[in-house]
Each structure stands twice: as C-alpha cells, then as structure tokens.
Amino acid sequence: PVLDEIKALYKKEGKEGPKQMASKVYYNRGILAAAVHLKAMENAVKAKGSGDITGEDVQKGFLAIKDFKLGGILPPLNFTNLDHEGGGWARVFRVEGDNFVPVSEWIRGYRDVVIQMLKEDH
C-alpha cells in the first residue's frame, strides 16, 4: 500500500523506484522510521499551532501517536510514556524466493510482563 504509493510517485516522473525497495526489510524499516517521525512532528505542529517547535513538543507528538497503521505494513502503533516501541507487536514471515510472506497474524508476546518490568525500572 504505502510502497505502491512511493512507486507511483516515481512512475509519475518517468523513473523506476529505488533498487533498495527490493530488499523490503531494510527499506520498510526506513519508511517506518521516517513516517513515525513525520507523524510526531505533524502532531507537534498541530498541537502548538504556531511558533518554534521544540524537542519537547516533538516528544509530546510521539506520545500522541495512536493507531498509526502506515498503509498496512504494520499493526496499529500506539506510543506511551512507558512504551516507545509502539505496542510490542511481532509477526512471523517465511522467505519465498525474493519475498517475505507472512505466516502468522500480528501478535504481542507477554506485553503485561514487559510493561510491569518497565514500571518497576522507572
């Protein structure tokens, strides 16, 4: 979904997408990192309205991220003071040729245990 949008932007300009898109794991991680940071900054600008955006504003922007899906390449992400991962989701994939094929749904392993450990550490 989001990768198709990127390919369409390149195609519109008569170009091929970057060859790095073929190695989907690393490319997708980069897309995810950029998209999450952009969403945090958008939230910061929306919350502040005007004036200079500070690091604290962006931090609050991260914490305002709720149910962020990025066009289907990840489960709904939610950030909190204790959870900067976005929810602790995982998914198992199998390599078939040049592709990664999901063989499980998105799962959350022992989230209650992880959150309790984080609370004890703070």
Predicted features, each with a name:
Residues 1-122:
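Extracytosolic ligand-binding ectodomains
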